[in-house]
Every structure is written in structure tokens, then in C-alpha cells.
């Protein structure tokens, strides 16, 4: 509802607002899926967003598993090769902060969702 009002205040037309709201509503790992190009793009962008700067709390002792994984990621590159219709997510994880397996524990469902979103867009997720 908040996004809808913001988009409305920005002057976006009703059809486009509806499309964006549908994409937002379908990007949750538990219940969402790609239902349009916009929703597929949102899923790819959202589910690949892992990086140290997402962690506001800098007290490592108080980190939960998500904070540790995000904080351990020191580099994230989302690379789109239009000619080959391929997306590559290149991540560097400092495994002195958390093991790489913790990343997969948290991000496996997100990765699967991204795979289906890429398939919807007829691109290869690398």
C-alpha cells in the first residue's frame, strides 16, 4: 500500500502502478513467483541483493545468521550479458566471518526463485 501511494504521488499511471504492485506482491520466497517481466526482474534484483552494507548493526557479537552472511559478503556483482541472455551473480564471501555453507543455507530458496524468474525471462542464470 505504501509503494502504491508513493508511485501515485509520483504521477505513475494506474496500469503501471498495478503492474509494480503485482510484482512486489509476488516476490516473497514463500508464496511468490514470476508472473510478468517486471516481477521476474524484481525477483532477480531482490534475491541477489546480499552485501555487507545491508547490515546496519555493526556489533558482530549480536549478529543473527542473516547479518553474518550479509556482513561476510564483501563484493557482489550482478552481470547481465544481453547477447548471450545470461545473468551472472559473482559474490565474494569472507569465510573468516561465516562459512560459505551458511550463505547457501539462507539463500538456496532465493536462488531457486531467481532461477525460475530467469527462466520466465528466457535468460540463463549463471
What are these regions (language model features)?
Residues 1-82:
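Divalent metal-dependent catalytic cores for phosphoryl transfer on phosphate-bearing substrates
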Residues 52-126:
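Terminal helices and disordered tails flanking the catalytic cores of nucleotide-processing hydrolases
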